[in-house]
């Protein structure tokens, strides 16, 4: 009888561990996806980066205006290509990645670039990505949009 109980407990522990492994694997996939995202960003491969989103994705981004804005892949690609024209050396340095549940990754990073007039910017940013079925469905970005002189 003791062997049966011990076997049952061992089976239960192994079963619970396998469920946790599945969740860990999902988080790892999402972290890899976001790592690839920033690699495409820093290579200025806007097409490949835009293909990491669903056909239309929700954005919350001070540069797009207030509220949630829906963007197509083409709009995403065009937005970053335009930004890259203004700042040819545009670069994001990831500071920290914070997995949050099965569908969210929070990324803290610093965006930098130099304009044609040699003025530089350095902008700390935090983005919450929602990832479903291997694609980004939401990109909620937060940064201080305050400009001097306003």
Regions found by a protein language model. Give the residues of each.
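A solvent-exposed, acidic/Ser-Thr-rich amphipathic alpha-helical stretch
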Residues: 50-100
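Short, cysteine-centered beta-strand-loop-beta hairpins and adjacent loop/turn segments enriched
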Residues: 85-86, 113-122
